[in-house]
Amino acid sequence: MLFNQRRGISPAALIIGSTMLITALSPQIRQRISGFITGQMNRRNSENNTFDASNVGNMVKQAFSGSSGSSGDNQDRSQHQSQRQNGRQHQHAGQQQPQHQHTQSQTRQTETAAKKRQPHYAEPIHFEQNAMNVMDDNTMMEMLEDLEPGR
């Protein structure tokens, strides 16, 4: 035998298996995938009846954000509802309680509702340019000298 056959599991199989295991155990990922499969995207495409290349970005966002509708529509609806409620509170302010307490509670309600709707993204990492170029020629020569002293 000229070539020895490797024994064990290949690295690609390990990566695929671990990815599938993580996906199966993570409830958020399962929810996103099941939402994607059940046809959230199909409903949007059937409404438009055309496939537009500009919708690809929105479809990817929707698939990974887990929301069924666009967040802009939801925010518009919540703003209209809060304006209606705020108008009602102004009408009844003299009858029940001072207006100041109503506006504070309304502000708290809209803040918590806005926090619930906003997707949470990781903060971007900003590198300085010096940190990007750490493997210059001198560094490589020092590493080679450390590995093979005397050359």
UniProtKB/Swiss-Prot annotation:
Region of interest called Disordered, as start-end residue ranges on this chain: 40-125
Record field: compositional bias (Low complexity): 83-110
Descriptive protein name: Uncharacterized protein YhcM
Extent of Polar residues compositional bias: 40-57
